[in-house]
Design a protein with these regions (language model features):
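PLP-dependent class I/II
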Residues: 1-270
């Protein structure tokens, strides 16, 4: 099951509807996974009010929450949000070094109740016995013997400039029919086009123009919802390349919209 989001994060009203629907079938939700900070793919952040409501629902319907926070330290504007884990012990908190040090270091951490950690440790041992000791020593050295917080501030400055470049280019080049999220941090933003647009069918044209994106339906369990959406990533390219990429992508979108408008005028699409 998946729960839609808006600019304030996961829709708690729709989550509660889903919980009630599951309960009518004599079943219950056991665990909910969420990225409350700068969610992938939408880039949105769950508000404090919705975080509080999510915890209330977890008690009311008796389920655990997995709080995945890979991007939480990469904030470019706004204030720090208190983690769900800091508010309730019904939460399993996941963190990673890969977004704030080096993507090739797949080292992370878990904060969870002791009994849950014991079971996770057994599963981990069955999967790979032990994570790379060398990688763990590198990470330990990074946090202990280097000015890592200063390095993190450089990352935040660089990524923030790239985000700003993408948002400015979207405002300048994208058609009025398009809308998008305004991420306060992280790597991604979410573009929504008119419902009759299929972004997946546009991907080949975008690649031919030298740009790419991730079609929205890739992020939905039914493979249908989100077909008129796309995820954009601003973390890698320079601001100049991002601006040019958005200009090219806007041209691809505008050409496709012109085609759809012709069908609308002919009455083939309503």
């Amino acid at each position: 099951h998946s729960v839609p989001f808006d600019d304030e994060g996961m829709r708690m009203d729709l989550l509660e509807e889903e919980l009630k629907r599951i309960g009518k079938g004599n079943k219950r939700l056991k665990m909910l996974y969420t990225i409350p900070n700068f969610q992938n793919p939408g880039g949105v952040t769950m508000t404090g009010e919705r975080r509080k409501r999510l915890i209330e629902l977890s008690h009311e319907y008796d389920f655990m929450i997995i709080e995945d926070d890979p991007y939480g330290r990469l904030r470019y504007e706004g204030g720090h949000m208190v983690p769900l884990k800091a508010q309730d012990d019904r939460v399993i908190y996941l963190g990673t070094i890969s977004k704030i040090f080096a993507p090739g270091l797949r080292i992370g951490w878990i904060c969870a109740p002791v009994d849950v950690l014991a079971r996770i440790s057994l599963v981990k041992q069955g999967a790979d016995l032990c994570g790379s000791t060398f990688d763990q020593v590198v990470v330990e050295h990074y946090f202990t013997d280097t000015p890592w917080q200063r390095t993190l501030q450089k990352f935040i400055k660089t990524y923030g400039e790239r985000r700003d470049a993408m948002l400015a280019a979207l405002e300048e080049y994208f058609p009025p029919e398009a809308s998008w999220t305004h991420p306060e941090g992280g790597f991604f933003l979410w573009v929504t086009l008119p419902k009759y647009v299929d972004t997946g069918s546009m991907l080949a044209d975008a690649l031919e123009a030298g740009v790419t994106f991730c079609p929205g339906d890739s992020f939905y369990v039914d493979g249908v919802t989100g077909r008129n959406c796309m995820r954009l990533n601003f973390s890698y390219e320079t601001p100049e390349n991002i601006t040019e990429a958005i200009r090219r992508l806007a041209k691809v979108i505008e050409e496709r919209l012109e085609l759809y408008r012709a069908f609308i005028d002919a009455g083939a699409i309503k």
